[in-house]
Amino acid sequence: MRSLSEKWQEGLDLMTSREFAELIGVSQATVSRALNGRSSVCEKTRIYIEKKAEEYGFVLNSQARSLKTSKTNTIGVLFPLNFDSLSKNLMFTHIFDQLQRELSRRSYDIMIVYDHDPEMKSNTFERVIRSGKLDGLINFRPQLLQREIDLIEKLRIPFVSLHSALQESSMLHQLMIDEENAGFQIGAYLGGQDVSRYVYMAVDDEPPERSARLHGYMKGLASAGKVLGEDSILTAERSPEAAYEAVMASSAMFCRERTGIFVYNDMMALGVLNALRELGVAVPDQAQVFGMDDIPLASWFTPRLSTMRSPVRQMVGDGCDLLIGLIEGEEIAPRTTYYQAQMVLRDTTR
């Protein structure tokens, strides 16, 4: 038989106050008094119980019912695990800015939810869902734990995933950019240029076999009779500094041949351009560079970056409409909606 702790970690059962009290070694009455703020509980015991309640995401049934029946007008935004800051992840800054505008226009506030360690007994995401503090969730994470998906479905939390595909479930609403088609367009375009070597710069937290951008790029090159060599896939963290270092570490590749480079995103592409400039590689004569997303910085720097423009405003607006419809009780079948990126040619390509 599973222990209470094991059942709770699986995320399938809502814990009663009796079970919680048994798990942490105090009486049910003490749990109730402590979490209701009664002065009869000593400070040390109250702090211990509150700490354990936070650890396990436990709330009293009376608190949960009150929160459940009260609309909070707050939407949680679940950020990726690799998220560092809005200043370094400018695509998320761009999306988040549009999201704030859309939700504010509809009189909703935002709560950012971010987990450093999703494998802990009850992570922030799960605790917030169980607490009833949110009317719904917007997700930016490409992966959820199975216990998290089970919890969303069990509690019927209005949930919409934006920008990234959730690999684990076809039962959730997903709105995303067609990254494979974007990669295909870039591959087909560069495949028609006077290029001897094709390069793809990937991110280190996305396995190549799961990269829609890479798959599309390879298909686009193949449509032009060209091939991406196995030794032409570079990997870096999601930052311009890491992309710069990756190019410098493989400098011979760019100095010997005419290259066509597809970089995972615009910020990394700016790092690639800095490295090429330092190596004396002329852009676009000796190296042509494509980014992805068309963040505002892509057109502000010199040379201006060629990229794929993601229809962020439309995607975010549709996502907010869908989420609020779910919150208001509309029966909407789970679906996946793809948005097509548009090629924007600037100074880094011919």
Task: Enumerate the predicted regions with their spans.
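Amphipathic helical "hinge" segments at domain boundaries
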Residues: 59-124
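Hinge/beta->alpha junction and helix N-cap segments in small-molecule ligand-binding domains
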Residues: 81-94, 112-120, 175-185, 201-248, ...
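N-terminal helix-turn-helix DNA-binding module of bacterial transcription factors
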Residues: 1-73, 350
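Short, well-structured alpha-helical segments in soluble
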Residues: 121-133, 243-256
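Short acidic/polar active-site loop segments enriched in Thr and Asp
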Residues: 27, 73, 134-135, 195-198, ...
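Flexible loop/turn connectors
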Residues: 248-350
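Flexible loop/hinge segments that line or gate small-molecule binding clefts
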Residues: 140-185, 267, 293-305
